[in-house]
Amino acid sequence: MSIQITIDGKTLTTEEGRTLVDVAAENGVYIPTLCYLKDKPCLGTCRVCSVKVNGNVAAACTVRVSKGLNVEVNDPELVDMRKALVEFLFAEGNHNCPSCEKSGRCQLQAVGYEVDMMVSRFPYRFPVRVVDHASEKIWLERDRCIFCQRCVEFIRDKASGRKIFSISHRGPESRIEIDAELANAMPPEQVKEAVAICPVGTILEKRVGYDDPIGRRKYEIQSVRARALEGEDK
């Protein structure tokens, strides 16, 4: 059913029940995301897509549009909130962009540029997390993980449907885990899918590195904003 909603004072016509992030993008309004993937079940873990819906802060990827919805995206308070959330993620992990293999292809890095982050306002933690290289095909850089849970939910063993990745422990001790036995059975295309689905440089394919020349990397060719507005990258 066609309905009308308002985004930043502009009245739009869309279909009831669609995801707010997608509706906004189709109407030229960019809302940054890190855990959301178009046409996949919503995770709502990163909160980087926070907006106001009828006066209340909500994660846009979790909101299904309905008649009369009033959405604020570019309010200064919200813009700073989203920037702060990105800064938190940079401060919590070890994101050394110049030396990271994912630089230029990293969604966190690209979103950082979009929210005008230069340096985090929060003290950096520099956590020490053990690298997991038990798998024959995947190198797991735990200290870069932002716990978006994309890999946990969407990368599964082809035969059994079991999860290949998981998160163990709680709070500051949380860390990403990999089932080496299941990972060793992953076909090459699924390994590449796992690397691509990770928004940072946590999941890396062994024996493949720095194969995209500077100037030809994903977000150098087209920004994360442009990709999102075209529905190609969330």
Swiss-Prot record:
Pfam families: Fer2_4, Fer4_Nqo3, NADH-G_4Fe-4S_3. Residues 2-77 form the 2Fe-2S ferredoxin-type domain. Its cofactor is [2Fe-2S] cluster; [4Fe-4S] cluster. SMART domains: NADH-G_4Fe-4S_3. GO terms for biological process: ATP synthesis coupled electron transport. GO terms for molecular function: 2 iron, 2 sulfur cluster binding; 4 iron, 4 sulfur cluster binding; hydrogen dehydrogenase activity; metal ion binding; NADH dehydrogenase (ubiquinone) activity. It catalyses: H2 + NAD(+) = NADH + H(+). The keyword Ribonucleoprotein does not apply. PROSITE patterns: 2FE2S_FER_2, 4FE4S_HC3, COMPLEX1_75K_1, COMPLEX1_75K_2, COMPLEX1_75K_3. The keyword NAD applies. Subunits alpha and gamma of HoxS constitute an NADH--oxidoreductase. This is NAD-reducing hydrogenase HoxS subunit gamma. It comes from Cupriavidus necator (strain ATCC 17699 / DSM 428 / KCTC 22496 / NCIMB 10442 / H16 / Stanier 337) (Ralstonia eutropha). The gene is hoxU.
